[in-house]
Amino acid sequence: MRTIYADNNATTQVAPEVYEAMIPFFTVDYFNPSSMYDPARGTANVVADARKRIARRLGAADPKEILFTSCATESNNTAILGAAKANPNRRHVITTAVEHPAVLEVCKDLQRSGYDVTFLPVDGEGNLSLSAFVRALRPDTLLVTVMHANNETGVVFPVEQLSRLTKETDPAIVFHTDATQSVGKLPVDLGGEFRHVDLLSFSGHKLHAPKGVGALYVRRGTRMKPFMIGGHQEESRRAGTENVPYIAGLARALDLAEENREADEARIARLRDRLEQAIEQRIPCVQVNGKHAPRLPNTLNVSCHYVEGEGMLYQLSAEGICASSGSACTSGSLEPSHVLIALGIPFTAVHGSVRFSFSRYNTEEDVDRIIKVFPQIVANLRKLSPYWDNEKNVPRPNAGQESRST
């Protein structure tokens, strides 16, 4: 049975072109870029070239604004904690209730350390209120950290507007966006619409580079203290020997993503939309989370009422289909998704969510297979539910109401 991988918001297959670009730096040009001999200077040039290419793809004014890290979690920690250390006289942070744990938990840690953190709510579609955002800005606000696209629902926040409103209110406020899910999928122009963004995080393994490499954009003039201290690497902003093969792979992956982005975006959106329509037509009592909000072209998050998501995922896996119930970083937890709770998803559905996320390697045949098996999986699980009337194929009266208090 062929595996159908539909969990690309969790991680992606390394592109063959990326793998090929990395190979020489494992066994031939394996030198430390900080060393002084000629071969090492060659690997230093590889890092410099990767930095230039990534800066160009993102519209950064200066390659030195690109800081290489090990992952988006490190990039987010560096951005948030680095900004906090560099601006000790300001103690207020603004974020949202639906951030990835790599941002949310850092903000909660700052809160425990005495910072005042505002967690902005979202509406039932996952949208932020611009007026509520502006009201949250204060004279002591040091940082705004708002994701570009949500990893669970795919809902896209208006970072262009949010960053502009921030700078119009107070140019000294640092604006950070976690663009892990959007870089390579959506346009990101740090010299254009994103020109008010000071810090931007992303990760290689979400755009067909390997796990273990990420980057942080740091706009010139942004006050930020280093998160990792030691050597002089990365302009003394991030200590540690550069991971040359992975950095080369990251640059190649971003090149590929941007070269094919518009065509990939259109084709992948068609796959997503086709699956969405089939699910809505074939499964009763299902809702598409974020359906009417701007969304990533590859992401579909559905909640099936009166079904446990864990059961759906196990049965999908038995059919060779890889999907998710939310962030892979918290998938070991039995707690319901904080993102769906923030959207106000009903009790009967919040535990029954499944996320399908596609990439350039998915096909019409993949979607055909999911459409064939997923409705039947939901139907089979509902037969076991005390809240579902199997004869009428509808919820029982007052289904689930007695369990809301638990």
Which residues does each PLM region occupy?
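Pyridoxal 5′-phosphate
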Residues: M1-T406
